[in-house]
């Protein structure tokens, strides 16, 4: 994908999906432990989410890092807002905040 196409793809994915996880691998088969952790958390909370595998598209990965100003993956978006990566998602899950954030999300 070209840069403009990547930006359009990213914006559409975030806009169309209440919960989207840009990750390495898929929710069925995460390709890194960090992505797997966030998938497990979302599954424990019973949240339906869209997963986008960034592993095989270097340009998309780099453009997403610039778009989000976040250097690592996974990247969790809820209602169009970047929540963060694995450590933040885990912390929010452990203190109950992630469940509150997701409570009003209708997927």
Curated annotation (Swiss-Prot):
Name recorded for this polypeptide: Probable monothiol glutaredoxin 2
Gene name as annotated: grxC2
UniProt binding sites for glutathione: 24, 61, 73, 86-87
Entry-linked PROSITE patterns: GLUTAREDOXIN_2 (PS51354)
Glutaredoxin domain: residues covered: 7-107
Entry keyword set: 2Fe-2S, Iron, Iron-sulfur, Metal-binding, Redox-active center
Pfam families membership: Glutaredoxin
Family statement drawn from the similarity comment of this UniProt entry: Belongs to the glutaredoxin family. Monothiol subfamily.
Binding site for [2Fe-2S] cluster: 32
SUPFAM superfamilies linked: Thioredoxin-like (SSF52833)
NCBIfam families: Grx4 family monothiol glutaredoxin
GO molecular function: 2 iron, 2 sulfur cluster binding; disulfide oxidoreductase activity; metal ion binding
């Amino acid at each position: 994908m070209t840069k403009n196409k990547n930006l359009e793809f990213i914006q559409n994915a975030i806009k169309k999906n209440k919960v989207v996880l840009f990750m390495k691998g898929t929710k069925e088969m995460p390709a890194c432990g960090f992505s797997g952790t966030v998938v497990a958390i979302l599954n424990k909370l019973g949240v339906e989410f869209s997963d986008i595998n960034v592993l095989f598209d270097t340009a998309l990965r780099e453009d997403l890092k610039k778009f989000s100003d976040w250097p690592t993956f996974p990247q969790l978006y809820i209602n169009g807002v970047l929540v963060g990566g694995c450590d933040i998602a885990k912390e929010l899950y452990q203190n109950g905040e992630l469940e509150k954030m997701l409570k009003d999300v209708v997927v």
